[in-house]
Curated annotation (Swiss-Prot):
Cross-referenced InterPro entries: Formate_THF_ligase, Formate_THF_ligase_CS, P-loop_NTPase
Pathway entry: One-carbon metabolism; tetrahydrofolate interconversion
Alphabetized GO MF terms: ATP binding; formate-tetrahydrofolate ligase activity
Protein name, UniProt field: Formate--tetrahydrofolate ligase
Class of the enzyme per the UniProt entry, highest EC level: ligase
Organism phylogeny: Bacteria, Pseudomonadati, Pseudomonadota, Betaproteobacteria, Burkholderiales
A matching Pfam family: FTHFS
Family listed: Belongs to the formate--tetrahydrofolate ligase family.
Catalytic activity, EC: 6.3.4.3
Species assigned in the record: Methylibium petroleiphilum (strain ATCC BAA-1232 / LMG 22953 / PM1)
Biological process terms in GO annotation: tetrahydrofolate interconversion
Catalytic activities: (6S)-5,6,7,8-tetrahydrofolate + formate + ATP = (6R)-10-formyltetrahydrofolate + ADP + phosphate
Positions annotated to bind ATP: 66-73
Record keywords: ATP-binding, Ligase, Nucleotide-binding, One-carbon metabolism
Length: 561
């Protein structure tokens, strides 16, 4: 069986100018090509689309994943190809992969099998340089903070209260907590510092929530980097850093156009993680896609409790976007995992474990319908070892909830294998069941910050309560009193469970969500609440994917999957 990269390397790609012209009607002068198979759309062209009507927005999310993931990106690509196959002009709209998980656990994030976006190697490795630009903008601000302190500290920044961290697009646990400026007076004032992964940075969040280059600059200026000795906030604007940061990001802000294996257009732009950030591609990319196609298929990271909740409560709240339908991705093996089966035994039929694990998908479906107010289709990513008895058990259970459960084979068959899912989505959207009318947020923005996270925890996670130490509660109160109480909350927690305990599988209830840390993201306009043991700078696994990635004698990349 061919690997993902082997399938991608054998594909016949069309020049991106041809894809843009034939599929989307975009003339060459609106494209900025990066080689033959990827290009950026000019911001002038993006602005020219604003008066066009919007297409239909389909959100792809998933059950709580296993470490291997459940195939959201693969489903998003396969569904996009399937919709095109049945005559619906469709654009796939995805996040860009981070090098951290590419070299860490996942080994690639451009879909899989015969449902991929290509050129796969380029997309997974550097792509058009957007993440590097975001990293540089973030670290320029960090350098200007320490430089300002070194040259007299006119703003009276308290070095003990600097909240801005440096970032790197790599999993590197050794950089989580460091001491910088060692080596003598010429190197600045020594202080504690640390690195986050670039996809958790506020610059990434701002990049993905900005609606224009002007909005980007304004938001960058609003970043709070720390506090003075009088405990007044210090911003990037105070340091006169936001203009140069905007210059570094001006080309990155242009959406990236590539294609699927079936030569259908796809826009990839931005890439915050959903467990430690808000988990959605850029607003500019999504809004542009909706002007160019009748259907737009996008994804939100990890499970419907994380990426989808943030898509609803942060991205939609800020942008005015409204999904028309949700596709919930699941696998039989993941449901058995949630039923208590060891990873090594997931390929063996186990109806008892599946019965228990179905509680996980039931809660996600209930959340989507009851708390997000959206219609839902369940797409089962098919594996050859799924048995008819297992599929029947799942379909029978979900039939009680009147939720369509459709087996999809896009990994093996491309768009053809997802046509049934595509037809189910079209039926929802075009027969008056579209979710835009019933759409709702999990909480009202006027609620206090603690009430917001309590609403997420009790409604979405099934928790009994939220706990905050006196120190954390005090920090939340300060943010509330300082005028940030109307901001939405971005919860950072494990993706593997509804709780903050990654080993609590299924649908745990009655647990407590412990808030460990609170961070103000004034430029992104949300409050990050870090819960449990989740880290904003991941580490590599014992056997990282980097060990298998290489360059063959023929000059081709091997080991990406």
């Amino acid at each position: 069986m061919a690997s993902d990269i082997e399938i991608a390397q054998k594909a016949t790609l069309r020049r991106i100018t041809q894809v843009a012209s034939d599929k989307l009607g975009i003339a060459d002068e609106h494209l900025e090509p990066y080689g033959h198979y990827k290009a950026k759309l000019s911001l002038d062209y993006v602005d020219s689309l604003k008066d066009r009507p919007n297409g239909k927005l389909i959100l792809v999310t998933a059950i709580s994943p296993t470490p291997a993931g459940e195939g959201k990106t693969t489903t998003t690509v396969g569904l996009g190809d399937a919709l095109n196959r049945i005559g619906k002009k469709t654009l796939v709209c995805l996040r860009e992969p981070s090098l951290g998980p590419v070299f860490g656990m996942k080994g690639g994030a451009a879909g899989g099998g015969h449902a991929q976006v290509v050129p796969m190697e380029d997309i997974n490795l550097h792509f058009t340089g957007d993440f590097n630009a975001i990293q540089l903008a973030n670290n320029l601000l960090a350098a200007m903070i320490d430089n300002h302190i070194h040259h007299g500290n006119e703003l009276d920044i308290d070095v003990r209260r600097i909240t801005w961290k440096r970032v790197l697009d790599m999993n590197d646990r050794a950089l989580r907590d460091i001491t910088c400026s060692l080596g003598g007076p010429g190197n600045g004032y020594p202080r504690e510092d640390g690195f986050d992964i670039v996809v958790a940075s506020e610059v990434m969040a701002i990049f993905c929530l900005a609606t224009s280059i002007q909005d980007l600059k304004e938001r960058l200026g609003n970043i709070v980097v720390g506090y003075t000795r009088q405990q007044k906030p210090v911003t990037a604007r105070d340091l006169k850093a936001h203009g140069a940061m905007t210059v570094l990001l001006k080309d990155a802000l242009k959406p990236n156009l590539v294609q699927t294996l079936e030569n259908n257009p796809a826009i990839l732009h931005g890439g915050p993680f959903a467990n430690i950030a808000h988990g959605c591609n850029s607003v500019i990319a999504t809004q542009t896609s909706l002007k160019l196609a009748d259907y737009v298929v996008t994804e939100a990271g990890f499970g419907a409790d994380l990426g989808a909740e943030k898509f609803i409560d942060i991205k939609c709240r800020k942008s005015g976007l409204r999904p028309d339908a949700v596709v919930l991705v699941a696998t039989i093996r993941a449901l058995k995992f949630h039923g208590g089966v060891d990873v090594k035994e997931l390929n063996t039929e186990n109806l008892d474990a599946l019965e228990k694990g179905i509680a996980n998908i039931e809660r996600h479906v209930a959340n989507i319908r009851e708390h997000y107010g959206l219609p839902c289709v369940v797409s089962i990513n098919n594996f050859t070892f799924d048995t008819p008895a297992e599929l029947k058990l799942l379909q029978d259970r979900m039939a009680k909830h009147e939720v369509p459960v459709i087996v999809a084979r896009h990994w093996a068959e491309g768009g053809k294998g997802a046509e049934d899912v595509a037809r189910a989505v079209v039926e929802i959207v075009e027969k008056g069941q579209s979710g835009a009318a019933g759409f709702k947020f999990v909480y009202d923005e006027s609620l206090p910050l603690m009430d917001k996270i309590t609403a997420i925890a009790t409604k979405i996670y099934g928790a009994a309560k939220v706990n905050a130490s006196a120190k954390v509660a005090g920090e939340i109160k300060k943010l509330q009193d300082a005028g940030y109480g109307h901001y939405p909350v971005c919860v950072a927690k494990t993706q593997y469970s509804f709780s903050t305990n990654p080993s609590a599988r299924g649908a745990p209830s009655g647990h407590t969500i412990d808030i460990r840390e609170v961070r103000l993201a004034a430029g992104a306009e949300f409050i990050v609440m870090i819960c449990g043991d989740v880290m904003t700078m991941p580490g590599l696994p014992k056997v990282p994917s980097a060990e298998k990635i290489d360059l063959g004698d023929d000059g081709k990349v091997v080991g990406l999957f």
